[in-house]
């Protein structure tokens, strides 16, 4: 298991790998998720005694809310939303820096 700075480095490495290959990653770590270009949420629910799994694409707002949920659980607040927005912004800055390298 990784968290904190180690999770951040894993996310950065996955992004660098994605520059030459397609990467699909399932994670509960916001540090890794923030690096992604596309986001999906996987939801499981029971209907009529059967379990169904749905994979739903997230738009910009959905991405922000899902990262906030990873930070703070179901209690999404202005603070968790701000933290998620900052993490997305920091990831974008890192990605731009890497793309500019020769």
Locations of regions flagged by a protein language model:
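ABC ATPase nucleotide-binding domain "signature" loop
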Residues: 1-2
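C-terminal lobe/lid and adjacent interdomain/linker elements of RecA-like ASCE P-loop ATPase modules
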Residues: 5-102
């Amino acid at each position: 298991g990784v968290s904190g700075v180690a999770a951040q480095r894993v996310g950065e490495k996955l992004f660098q790998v994605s520059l030459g290959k397609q990467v699909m990653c399932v994670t509960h770590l916001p540090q890794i998720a923030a690096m992604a270009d596309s986001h999906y949420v996987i939801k499981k629910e029971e209907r009529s005694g059967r379990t169904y799994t749905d994979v739903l694409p997230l738009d910009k707002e959905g991405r922000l809310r899902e990262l906030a949920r990873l930070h703070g659980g179901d209690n999404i607040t202005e603070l968790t939303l701000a933290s998620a927005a900052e993490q997305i912004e920091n990831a974008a800055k890192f990605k731009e820096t890497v793309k500019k390298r020769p």
